Amino acid sequence: MTAILERRESESLWGRFCNWITSTENRLYIGWFGVLMIPTLLTATSVFIIAFIAAPPVDIDGIREPVSGSLLYGNNIISGAIIPTSAAIGLHFYPIWEAASVDEWLYNGGPYELIVLHFLLGVACYMGREWELSFRLGMRPWIAVAYSAPVAAATAVFLIYPIGQGSFSDGMPLGISGTFNFMIVFQAEHNILMHPFHMLGVAGVFGGSLFSAMHGSLVTSSLIRETTENESANEGYRFGQEEETYNIVAAHGYFGRLIFQYASFNNSSSLHFFLTAWPVVGIWFTALGISTMAFNLNGFNFNQSVVDSQGRVINTWADIINRANLGMEVMHERNAHNFPLDLAVVEAPSTNG
């Protein structure tokens, strides 16, 4: 008997690389989206850390009045921020090689644009990587769909809003106080608190927090005990076990008696779909609201006060909001313009004399 042994052709380097990239056996899945995600997020993170510590002041308003945002220029963790790219640059693509020098690039806030564009590309690739891993494992794609909500929100404030307003200088600063400043100015200019999509977003975030806390507390309160009273209930479970770890019927019964019968779910799939959909849809609407207000389709305004038969103003909460908005608008960019737009367009009263 003759045995014929064929020599197996060695796999090419590219083939081994492809297999390694797409292998689900790796401790951390990389995937083709990860090939782009890793360098973009590393770049964004590295530049953010360096700029937050040591970036020189940035001429954000384009009026030769630089604003410092880094720790070495007098800020702390709360007040520090990556200052947005200068209004003098507008929406122009502004990589380092477009500036005459690195000093000019830093003065005009080049790091902000670099960080934001790499970050948005990176988180979009992270979302794609979630879908890719789900696909390879034979899972459904809803993890990536859920993650699309924060991706949409980040894209709205860092990219869509600057595009609508005509300059990256209107983007959200990358810092704690900078975020609050962005929110205050956004309210002043767009009355976001009176926009229905923002209201849906608030309901989504707060409602999602409430439902998450309710679900977690119900589950942990209705665990099926597999141990004695002298042992931890956690010892009775194995990671990935097929058996249920908690009694959904007991949880359903408790909650149904606490509120009313139909306020609780007796189907696990329906319950978890609801827990996912509520905050995701809310944040989608918030991102959509930011994206429409970017082009000045603003929240409801009540600029026409309620008056009585004699023409006297009857003060309402809307008047308080309008006054607050004007005050906030006056205070921001105070050196770039003397009056808020709402006051600047009003015809000045004539004077005799």
Swiss-Prot record:
A quinone binds at residues 215, 264-265. It is found in: Plastid, Chloroplast thylakoid membrane. Fe cation binds at residues 215, 272. Tyr-161 forms a radical intermediate that is referred to as redox-active TyrZ, YZ or Y-Z. C-terminally processed by CTPA; processing is essential to allow assembly of the oxygen-evolving complex and thus photosynthetic growth. Pheophytin a binds at residue 126. Signal peptide: none annotated. [CaMn4O5] cluster binds at residues 170, 189, 332-333, 342, 344. The D1/D2 heterodimer binds P680, chlorophylls that are the primary electron donor of PSII, and subsequent electron acceptors. It shares a non-heme iron and each subunit binds pheophytin, quinone, additional chlorophylls, carotenoids and lipids. D1 provides most of the ligands for the Mn4-Ca-O5 cluster of the oxygen-evolving complex (OEC). There is also a Cl(-1) ion associated with D1 and D2, which is required for oxygen evolution. The PSII complex binds additional chlorophylls, carotenoids and specific lipids. One of its GO terms (molecular function) is oxygen evolving activity. The modification Phosphothreonine is found at residue 2. GO terms for cellular component: chloroplast thylakoid membrane; photosystem II. Photosystem II (PSII) is a light-driven water:plastoquinone oxidoreductase that uses light energy to abstract electrons from H(2)O, generating O(2) and a proton gradient subsequently used for ATP formation. It consists of a core antenna complex that captures photons, and an electron transfer chain that converts photonic excitation into a charge separation. The D1/D2 (PsbA/PsbD) reaction center heterodimer binds P680, the primary electron donor of PSII as well as several subsequent electron acceptors. This is Photosystem II protein D1. It comes from Aethionema cordifolium.
